[in-house]
């Protein structure tokens, strides 16, 4: 029997000497068992003995080793999440040094494009190769990209460095969640995964504050140098304390190459790049009807159809095995995470703009005013993780999170130039509560309800969908903001050039204008920012609808077992 044929299913199931499952037997067994499990799951008939979380758990850590691994993973997640937004407040200084105003969009998108593009590929790498070494390789690539960004003498070098860092970053969030799932029993995973995901959310919020502080007081290059010591600590900790070196599936190199789904990857990677470029360029750099934007959307559609067809044909060898999406808990969680993450990042990007433009805060002050969101997010992420572990239920937390997100988004959309601290502090606390309670739950779903052989791919899938939701809807919000502000300026202040006002940035308003003109511009900025919050309201409401399909059934494994 050829290697490729064996991948499609062997005659019997067997385990390797190292404890990993053979690829040829895995495919046949997973297809049969997962089909049976999915059917029963949809009917709500899966009992505790049948659930995959009853599998024997190995590699569990305790004591100081678990503490060290958790700290190391948090350092790594902190850095990779910082890179999503830290460059925003450093852009003016970077463009001034490199004389590269036309490259501004690439400073953020280069990292985002490569991160989203390779996340699913890392899911397959984590399936066929030891998690430890794949993770350390991704961390090395991320650190290399950060180093290039720090030392680069040109704008092109910065863009290339950001792209390289994104290649590594695409494997670090899902890898961190996989490592922690290997280190703790399934009953405790929600608590630990919740804490790690809270670090991701917190870093996304405070990144602009750190970027502004580095730019103002040291150098913008420290936005990237900061990753080096944190990454080194993470690498040392994982290298010496995490000893799980067995791949999920044992296979020959040729079988691994086929199992990595090269055809699917060849259509997926350029397809995602086309989608993200189209959403970032459309309405901002080029009109939506521009031939380049239309061509990108068309190419994305063609590549998406090809990718779906290849996934259906490849089945168990696919980047995303189709059976994973049959269970309503999985696709419901994916849709929920996509929408909730889009809402969250809309506020992460535009609340600081409201503080700076409407209330006259500096970049550093706006970061400080975001602390209610940061603190409440961390507190309730930890609390929700513990409560999920204690109660064993996921659905109620998703519904509560989405409902509170809808309410807090609605309240934030009522902000006015005259709004006091009590309003924006209270609304942010409520928003932090909603995000903290539910942001990480889609990861809980895949790590507590799927077989261990599916967890790497499913974790990468959920991570990718959440990142994609943030990337797409931030671009949509940006277009809504620019279009609304430009339209209002042309209508109310026709003597001003809307492009000049927008490009000057929110922190420059009070230095360029005064009197009645400034008062009017502040009101127009307020309206434009609030306009993006309407998008967040819709996304939060959509996440609530998605949460309603999640089954209210206790997790497979009770606490303490």
Curated annotation (Swiss-Prot):
Full protein name: Efflux pump bfoC
Transmembrane segments: 59-79, 103-123, 128-148, 164-184, 194-214, 222-242, 257-277, 293-313, 335-355, 378-398, 425-445, 457-477, 530-550
Compartmental location: Cell membrane
A GO cellular component annotation in the UniProt record: plasma membrane
Classification via SUPFAM superfamilies: MFS general substrate transporter
Bias kind Basic and acidic residues: ranges: 38-55
Keyword annotations from UniProtKB, A to Z: Cell membrane, Membrane, Transmembrane, Transmembrane helix
Species this protein is from: Aspergillus brasiliensis (strain CBS 101740 / IMI 381727 / IBT 21946)
Comp. bias intervals (Polar residues): 24-36
Keyword Metal-binding carried by entry: no
Its job: Efflux pump; part of the gene cluster that mediates the biosynthesis of bifonsecin B, a dimeric gamma-naphthopyrone.
GO molecular function: transmembrane transporter activity
Superkingdom, natural source: Eukaryota
Primary location group: membrane
Family: Belongs to the major facilitator superfamily. TCR/Tet family.
Membrane disposition: Multi-pass membrane protein
Disordered as annotated region, ranges: 1-55
């Amino acid at each position: 029997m050829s290697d490729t044929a064996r991948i499609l299913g062997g005659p019997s199931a067997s385990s390797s000497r190292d404890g990993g499952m053979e690829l040829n037997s895995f495919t046949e067994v997973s297809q049969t068992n997962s089909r049976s499990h999915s059917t029963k799951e949809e009917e709500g008939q899966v009992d505790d003995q049948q659930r995959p979380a009853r599998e024997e758990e190995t590699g569990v850590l305790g004591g100081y080793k678990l503490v060290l691994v958790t700290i190391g993973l948090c350092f790594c997640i902190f850095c990779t999440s910082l890179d999503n937004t830290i460059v925003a407040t450093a852009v003016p200084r970077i463009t001034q040094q490199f004389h590269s105003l036309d490259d501004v969009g690439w400073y953020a998108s280069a990292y985002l494009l490569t991160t989203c593009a390779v996340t699913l590929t890392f899911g397959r790498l984590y399936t066929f190769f030891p998690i430890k070494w794949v993770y350390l390789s991704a961390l090395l690539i991320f650190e290399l990209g950060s180093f290039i960004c720090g030392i680069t003498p040109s704008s092109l070098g910065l863009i290339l460095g950001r792209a390289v860092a994104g290649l590594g970053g695409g494997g670090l969030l899902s890898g961190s969640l996989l490592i922690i799932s290997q280190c703790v029993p399934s009953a405790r995973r929600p608590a630990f995964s919740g804490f790690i995901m809270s670090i991701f959310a917190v870093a996304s919020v405070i990144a602009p504050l750190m970027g502004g502080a580095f730019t103002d007081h040291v150098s913008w290059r420290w936005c990237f140098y900061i990753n080096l010591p944190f990454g080194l600590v993470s690498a040392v900790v994982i290298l010496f304390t995490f000893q799980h070196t067995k791949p999920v599936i044992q296979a020959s190199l040729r079988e691994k190459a086929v199992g990595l789904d090269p055809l699917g990857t060849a259509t997926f990677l350029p397809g995602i790049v086309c989608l993200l470029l189209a959403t970032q360029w459309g309405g901002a750099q080029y009109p939506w009807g521009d031939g380049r934007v239309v061509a990108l959307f068309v190419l994305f559609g063609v590549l998406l159809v090809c990718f779906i067809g290849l996934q259906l044909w490849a089945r168990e060898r696919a980047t995303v095995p189709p059976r994973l999406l049959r269970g309503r808990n999985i696709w419901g969680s994916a849709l929920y995470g996509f929408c909730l993450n889009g809402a969250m990042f809309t506020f992460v990007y535009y609340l600081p703009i409201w503080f700076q433009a409407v209330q006259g805060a500096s970049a550093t002050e706006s970061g400080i005013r975001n602390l209610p969101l940061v603190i409440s997010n961390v507190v309730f992420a930890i609390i929700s993780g513990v409560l999920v572990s204690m109660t064993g239920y996921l659905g109620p937390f998703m519904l509560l999170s989405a409902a509170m997100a809808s309410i807090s988004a609605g309240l934030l959309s009522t902000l006015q130039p005259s709004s006091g601290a009590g309003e924006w502090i209270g609304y942010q606390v409520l928003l932090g509560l909603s995000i903290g309670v539910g942001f990480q739950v889609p990861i809980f779903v895949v790590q507590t309800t799927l077989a261990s052989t599916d967890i790497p791919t499913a974790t990468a899938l959920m991570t990718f969908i959440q990142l994609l939701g943030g990337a797409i809807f931030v671009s949509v919000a940006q277009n809504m903001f620019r279009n609304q502000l430009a339209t209002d300026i042309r209508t109310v202040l026709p003597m001003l050039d809307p492009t000049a006002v927008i490009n000057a940035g929110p922190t420059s308003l009070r230095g360029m204008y005064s009197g009645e003109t400034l008062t009017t511009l502040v009101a127009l900025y307020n309206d434009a920012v609030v306009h993006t919050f309407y998008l967040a309201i819709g996304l939060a409401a959509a996440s609530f609808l998605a949460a309603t399909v999640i089954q209210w059934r206790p997790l497979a494994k009770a606490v303490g077992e």
